[in-house]
Curated annotation (Swiss-Prot):
SUPFAM superfamilies: CCCH zinc finger, WD40 repeat-like. Pfam families: WD40 (PF00400), zf-CCCH (PF00642). This is Zinc finger CCCH domain-containing protein 62. GO terms for molecular function: DNA binding; zinc ion binding. WD repeats lie at residues 129-168, 210-247, 256-293, 296-335, 383-419. It comes from Arabidopsis thaliana (Mouse-ear cress). Keywords: DNA-binding, Metal-binding, Repeat, WD repeat, Zinc, Zinc-finger. InterPro entries: G-protein_beta_WD-40_rep, WD40/YVTN_repeat-like_dom_sf, WD40_repeat_CS, WD40_repeat_dom_sf, WD40_rpt, WDR86-like, Znf_CCCH, Znf_CCCH_sf. The gene is ZFWD4. A zinc finger (C3H1-type) spans 89-116. The lineage of its organism: Eukaryota, Viridiplantae, Streptophyta, Embryophyta, Tracheophyta. Transmembrane segments: none annotated.
C-alpha cells in the first residue's frame, strides 16, 4: 500500500497529508478530540504506587479509572503455542526441542513445554507477518486496532477481534520506534515523526530541523512530545489545542548526549533519557534543562522505568540498576542485579492479580525474568525463540512482546489468580 499523499504545509515544521493511510485504518470519522492528557497505560509513567512523591515533596496523584477493555484477538488464539503450565521450581527453562516442535519426551521431559511459567500469565495470540526485529507495539486508547512496526520497513495494523492483519503499509524507510498516547499514534522515522489520530483520521508529518537521524525512542510528558534520535539530540514538540489542523508545534532540541538516544522514562516532573554513550540524563520538565548525568553503566542503556520514588535502568553491560534519591537530592545506585552472560534489552512493569508490582526484564538469550518489586525476588519467566526487543503494557492485564525475528505475542495476566 502506498501511503504517500498530497501535502499541505503549516508553520512549525508540520506537514499535513490529505486522505493518507490513517483514513484506511479508520472506517468512520469521530468528533475531534484534542490531545490534552497522557495515556494512562503508557509504560513510561510511574505505574506502581498510588501516589508518587517527587524529590521536592510534591504529591503526584494517580487516577484509578480504566477504559473499557478491548477484545483480545480472539480468533488468533489458535496460533498460541501455550502448553500446560508447569509449577515445579525445577522447570525454569523451556525445552529447546519443544520450541522447534521436535521434543519426543512429552510430559516426561524435564524442561518446560510452555512459553511461560508464571501463574495466571497466558499467551493468547502469536501474530506473524513481520520478518525482522520489532521496534514498537501500540494499542491506542479506545481503539480495536493494534499497531506494530519493524525494521523490515512495514507498519502492520491488526484487528483485535479476529487477530488478522488488516493493513500492511510499506513505509519506504526503516522504522525506529512507535508509541500511542490517547487517540494519537506516533511513528519514528529517519529525520521525522509521523503522527495520526485513529478517531479523526488526521495525519501529520512532524519534520525535524536539519538532519538528526533515526528517531529511536519517543515519549510524552507535560503536553510535550520528546523524540530521541541517532544523533544524540532530543527533539521536542508542544501539543496545542487551538487548531485541529496544527496540533503540534516544534519547540526546541535538547543537547547533551554524545551517542544515540535509546530510551525514555518519566517520573514526577523529570524526564530521563538513556543513550549509547552509557549515560542517563535527567531533565527538568519545567525548564527543559539537564540537571544531572548518571554514569554507572558500562554499556549502552537499553531501557528505563520509573517505579515509586526510584528509577530502574537496564544495559547491554548485563546489569539492572535501581536508583534512589539520597538525602541531598542526588540519584544514586542502591541495588544492582547482574545477569551473567546475557545483556538486558527491555524493561516493563505492571501489577499482578493481587495488585503487587512486578517487573519484566528481557535478556539476550530470549528469556524474560519476572520479579517482585522492590525485592527483585524471581516470580517466573517468559520465553521466546529470539531476544524480545520490546515490551508494551496494555489495559487490564494485557502485555505485548515483540522479538528480533518479528514475532509479536499477546499475553494476558488473569485477574483474581493467587500468586
Amino acid at each position: 500500500m502506498d501511503y504517500k499523499a498530497p501535502r499541505r504545509y503549516y508553520s512549525h515544521g508540520v506537514v499535513a497529508r490529505q486522505q493518507d493511510f490513517a483514513t484506511d485504518i479508520v472506517t468512520r470519522r469521530r468528533p475531534y478530540v484534542p490531545y490534552d492528557r497522557p495515556n494512562k497505560f503508557s509504560r513510561s509513567l510511574v505505574w506502581t504506587s498510588k501516589e508518587y512523591k517527587s524529590p521536592e515533596g510534591n504529591n503526584m496523584p494517580r487516577t484509578n479509572d480504566v477504559s473499557p477493555k478491548p477484545p483480545v484477538l480472539g480468533l488468533a488464539r489458535k496460533n498460541a503455542a501455550c502448553g500446560p503450565m508447569r509449577s515445579s521450581s525445577l522447570r525454569k527453562w523451556v525445552c529447546k526441542y519443544w520450541k522447534d516442535g521436535k521434543c519426543k519426551r512429552g510430559e516426561q521431559c524435564q524442561f518446560l513445554h510452555s512459553w511461560s511459567c508464571f501463574p495466571g500469565l497466558a499467551m493468547v495470540a502469536s501474530l506473524e507477518g513481520h520478518n525482522k526485529e520489532l521496534k514498537g507495539i501500540a494499542l491506542p486508547e479506545g481503539s480495536d486496532k493494534l499497531f506494530s512496526v519493524s525494521i523490515d520497513g512495514t507498519l502492520r495494523v491488526w484487528d483485535c477481534n479476529s487477530g488478522q492483519c488488516v493493513h500492511s503499509i510499506n513505509l519506504d524507510a526503516e522504522a525506529g520506534s512507535l508509541i500511542s498516547e490517547g487517540p494519537w499514534v506516533f511513528l519514528g522515522l529517519p529525520n521525522a515523526i509521523k503522527a495520526f489520530n485513529v478517531q479523526t483520521s488526521q495525519d501529520l508529518h512532524l519534520q525535524a530541523a536539519g538532519v538528526v537521524g533515526q528517531v529511536n525512542a519517543m515519549t510524552i510528558a507535560n503536553g510535550m512530545l520528546f523524540a530521541g534520535t541517532s544523533s544524540g539530540s532530543i527533539l521536542v514538540w508542544k501539543a496545542t489545542t487551538d487548531s485541529e489542523s496544527d496540533p503540534f508545534k516544534y519547540l526546541t532540541s535538547l543537547e547533551g548526549h554524545s551517542g544515540e538516544v535509546t530510551c525514555f522514562a518519566v517520573g514526577g516532573q523529570m524526564l530521563y533519557s538513556g543513550s549509547v554513550d552509557k549515560t542517563i540524563k535527567m531533565w527538568d520538565l519545567n525548564t527543559l534543562q539537564c540537571i544531572m548525568t548518571l554514569k554507572q553503566h558500562t554499556g549502552t542503556v537499553t531501557s528505563l522505568l520509573c517505579w515509586d520514588k526510584c528509577l530502574i535502568s537496564s544495559s547491554l553491560d548485563g546489569t539492572i540498576k535501581v536508583w534512589a534519591y539520597s538525602e541531598n537530592g542526588i540519584l544514586k545506585v542502591v541495588q544492582t542485579r547482574r545477569q551473567e552472560q546475557s545483556s538486558v534489552h527491555a524493561l516493563s512493569g505492571m501489577h499482578d492479580a493481587e495488585a503487587k508490582p512486578i517487573i519484566f526484564c528481557s535478556y539476550q538469550n530470549g528469556t524474560v525474568g519476572i520479579f517482585d518489586l522492590p525485592s527483585f525476588q524471581e516470580r517466573g519467566r517468559m520465553f521466546s525463540t529470539h531476544t524480545i526487543a520490546t515490551l508494551t503494557i496494555g489495559p487490564q492485564g494485557l502485555l505485548f512482546s515483540g522479538d528480533e525475528s518479528g514475532n509479536l505475542r499477546v499475553w494476558t495476566l488473569a485477574a483474581g489468580n493467587k500468586v
